[in-house]
Every structure is written in structure tokens, then in C-alpha cells.
Amino acid sequence: MSVIRNILNSRSSKGGNFFNTLHKLLGFRPKDLSVYERAFTHRSLNVKDPSGNPINYERLEFLGDAMLGSVIASHLYQEVPEGDEGYLTKMRSKIVSRKHLNELGKDLNLIRFVKSNIPNDQFGVNIHGNIFEALVGAIYLDRGYKYCNRFIYNRVIEPYVDIETLEGRVISYKSLLIEWCQKQKKEFNYQVYEDTGRDELKHFAVKLWIDKKVIAKARATSKKKAEEKASKRAYYALQNKMN
């Protein structure tokens, strides 16, 4: 119990640096600092409550994801009355994309609050978006929907959500390319081939074929990333034909 208390309460005093920094970041006074401590606790600490349940940000991340989706959906519904379900879903996906959430987390420098047994430079890039979602979840638990809605509006919607700009933002180059190939009745294929790189991490190499011609090649640490990278290169190579 003392270990749990020390980890979660080490910064949880009102008037302390953690409280003051959070107050400035959120735009309002947090009430239950322990919720925010949990939002910045990484699973690598392997902390558990008396019932054996893990204490980390992952459940708050789930909650924050749902709150972001709800608030953004409500905003789009009110601001774009002419948008149908498909359009609104597409716009929401662009706003809450992993890339965008990572940028938000980086801009707020949330990683400075994270407690873990892993050096910060060894985290994957998605840590920034994950803890941003966890923070949103913590706000909801601490202050309710009103304050959560206000934070999302001030930090996400007002500075970043411009419908005209979003309409031109590509979520997935692979999806865009597949849609174009299908409309143009073109054959396409993503071929995984042997990667000859000497990186320590395993890489996947992909060739993108369109109408029996290699249009682009790419390599990355996952097949999905390599296919997206190849699709992006193909998109720019074929941009004049696709637009």
C-alpha cells in the first residue's frame, strides 16, 4: 500500500508544482489530483491497487477516446448541418486521427508528466496521443462533461478544426489510392518482398503494383506502415491523374 501511495501521491498536493502546472494547462483548477496522476502513470511501473487491478493510464485513455469522439461529433453535427453521416464520420476521423492526437500531446509536452520505468526517448510516437486521451478521460472523471467539453473545445476544436482545411486532409493514402483504382478499374497489388536492410529492428519492404507496373516502393517496421508509405509515394507520383 505504501508503494502505491508514494507513487500516486508524490505530486498530489494542492499548491504544489504539479497542481499549478495542471491548473495552467487545463484552464481550471483540478480537484482530484490522483486521477491525473493515474493519467500519467505508465504500465511499466506495474502498480496495482489493493484488489490487484493495474494502476495506469490505459483505462483513462479508453474513456478519453470516447469523450473526444462524442464532443467532436456534437460540434460537427451543429456546425455542418448539410453534412450526411458519412461526411461527418470522415471529418471526425480526421480530427481524432492518431497523428493529430500525437501532435496535440507533443504541443502540450505531456510526456514531461509521465512516470515509468522506460526512458522517454524509448517510447513509441503514439505515447503523446495516448496520454492526451488519458488526460481527457481524467478531466471527465474529475470535473464532468462541462469541463471536459470546454477543454476539448479550447485545446482541439478552436485552434485546429477548420472544415475547409480538414476536407483536404488525407487520413489514409492507401484508402485513397484503392478507392481511385477501383473507380478507374485499375488492377493493384501490394507485394511484400525480402528486406535487405541492416536495421536492428525487423523491417517490411513493399512494392505497389498498378496495372502490372511498380509505381512505388517503401519499407517500414510494419507491413501496414510500409503499405501506407508506398501509397503516399504513389499518390504524389500519380497526383495529376488522381485530381
Swiss-Prot record:
Arranged from A to Z, the UniProt key words for this protein are: Cytoplasm, Endonuclease, Hydrolase, Magnesium, Metal-binding, mRNA processing, Nuclease, RNA-binding, rRNA processing, rRNA-binding, tRNA processing
Q: Which cysteines in this chain are paired by disulphide bridges?
A: none
Q: What is its EC number?
A: 3.1.26.3
Reaction catalyzed: Endonucleolytic cleavage to 5'-phosphomonoester
Q: What CDD domains does this protein's entry cite? A: RIBOc (cd00593)
Task: Outline what the protein does.
Answer: Digests double-stranded RNA. Involved in the processing of primary rRNA transcript to yield the immediate precursors to the large and small rRNAs (23S and 16S). Processes some mRNAs, and tRNAs when they are encoded in the rRNA operon. Processes pre-crRNA and tracrRNA of type II CRISPR loci if present in the organism.
| Subunit composition and interactions | Homodimer.
This protein is called what? Answer: Ribonuclease 3
Species in which this protein is naturally found:
Zunongwangia profunda (strain DSM 18752 / CCTCC AB 206139 / SM-A87) (Wangia profunda)
Q: Which gene encodes it?
A: rnc
